[in-house]
Amino acid sequence: MDALFMPQFHPARDIHDVYFVKEPTHARSIAEPYLTRVVQAHEKGTGAGSTGWGYQFDVERAKRLVLRSQGTAVSARALAGGASVPGKYFSIARCFRYDQVDATHATDFFQVEGIVLGADINFRTLLGLLNLFAREVAQAKEVKFLPAYFPFTEPSVEMHVRHPKLGWMELGGAGLFRPEVTTPLGVSVPVIAWGLGLDRMAMVALGIHDIRDLFSADLDFVRTMRGNF
């Protein structure tokens, strides 16, 4: 989350800094020059009007090993690895959060993560791709977008689709990476990013009313699932 320009003591990190690895507890090192650049972004900003968060970055805290809480961490690693421009990168990431288990939430789930970068990329490009995912993958009939806030994107948006029984349901969040994210990773062109709940997309596509049923051991139930996903 440090590479995503989320302050180390920000309340938004409460759902991310939860599942800590017991052994080893810390990474041996963090690759340079990315560590120095990320520290600079947090403490003083990246220039061009960016002032950072104005606190002293704790490198030892950054080395703590935690289970991934969202797939955007994979996107940051892809950018740091020397992403091509223009380029498109996608992944399916298993994530872990301390959520109250109910019909639409689980403590571990899968996210479809994507980034697209290029000189001509903009917010309209992002909305078009999100709409395509919702209609072609989740097979949603109704889609809507709502303004959102994430520390690492600006502007940001949430995508919701209508489930036949549960009503409007959030599929995930998206936005344009802030310069404080892309500059330390060596990227100078716009980058759009999104993380969508694959399990929830399957719920809509398969007509399932409870996310726990996706992992049911009831073979009769599995055989009666409609369609393919």
PLM region spans:
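TRNA-recognition modules of translation machinery and tRNA-sensing kinases, especially anticodon-binding
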Residues: 1-229
